[in-house]
Amino acid sequence: MLENNLKQWFGHESFHPGQKEVIESVLQGNHTLGVLPTGSGKSLCYQFPTYMQQKPTLIISPLISLMDDQVMQLKSQGERRVVCIHSGMDEQEKKENINVLNQSRFIFLSPEFILQSHHFNLIKNIPFGLVVLDEAHCLSDWGYDFRPHYALIGQITHHFKLATILALTATAPPHLTSDLEHILKVKLNTIQTTMNRKNISLSHFNFKDDDEKIEWLLKFIESSGPTIIYVSSKKICLQLAKLIYQHGYLTGIYHGDLTYQERQTVQNQFINNFIPVIVATSAFGMGVNKKDIRTVIHFHLSSSPSNYLQEIGRAGRDGKQSQAISLYQPDDAYILETLLFNDAIVSEDVETFELGAFLPPNKEEILTVLHQNYTFKELKHIFKTSYIRKQAGYQRIIGYTRIDQCRRKFLLEFFGESPNQSNECCDNDSDLSKIECYNRKKVKRQFTFNEKIKNLFRV
């Protein structure tokens, strides 16, 4: 029965592992957490029940690029009753999309948008059959001290009492189910496959300084194929992209300060192979579905094992052999520690907030949002727990740079998973084949990097 509909609606002969089990759970009315690896077709898990039940679906999504990609995918399948509203749109486009909300089958919104009362009023009477929390690990990873509105999503799901909740992610630490159940105030049926992407080999290189890293990188990208290079800051993003461009390769930049239109331009040029290399902060993360990315390089370490698996999961979505490579020099530990802990909210900040004493504006804003739903005692416990988890993630990522055991096993055991060793596994236990996918130099005349950026964005 389900396979017949799969063929009719999506043109597929069979489900990927985990898809059918998640769909069956949802169709039985169970609130469900689906943990499926990156690139395994998680969006089918909500599209299929939507067509089956003939009721509208609300998808709460963390990133604009992720929403746009899924809307584009649905429209390419012939679906016209799909709409999203986000901060990258101009007012006219927002108005047009608001006008068709009640006629739409798939509605994509951010938590910040939907939790504003005048926006919530636009959808509160829509009879949703399904409420989807996409990239659900973000509720646990981001939902307290980065995107605090995530921790209030339970207000939305509680309103739509007749809707089934479906949370989807590719990375699930052992505490994720209990975190989500606490936020949503429901019991979840957890269906978990593997987080392991066997077609992505893992390698790591240690250097004495950034100059050594850059020298290695400029040589390596000659044959790395379509490549994302992750860095820790906008400043390094611009500097590294400029060096790669001067080396002869058209290079895109992607960071949080770009406008929505600029991000779209870079993504489209990368997806359509006009540029072979993107240098990005983690803002590039989850939203681009380019299937033939061969290489993901972390010039700086990722902020957690969960983020690392998400970021390397951009590679090899066509099923072909791909590679994830991390680079490290001694100063990088300080960079990561600063990013993770310098502005982290701790229980002492909650006490200060409770007393009405001065706090930095960003911390005060976050605690003000969260205090709508949580007592001071609960907030102290939340941030104490969050700090301990960050410390554990930090130690695991730093440990990754020092180990001589299987890298895949070391990463996945953090999530309670014990993978079987595969060919092309990692540099510690396999003789990895070199991926030869040459990036042709395309810089014909010597534009400056700034001229190239101006041409790219037409400024």
Q: Where do the PLM segments sit?
A:
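C-terminal helicase lobe
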Residues: 228, 234-236, 249, 268-275, ...
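Helicase motor core with emphasis on the C-terminal RecA-like subdomain
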Residues: 2-45, 49-55, 60, 65-108, ...
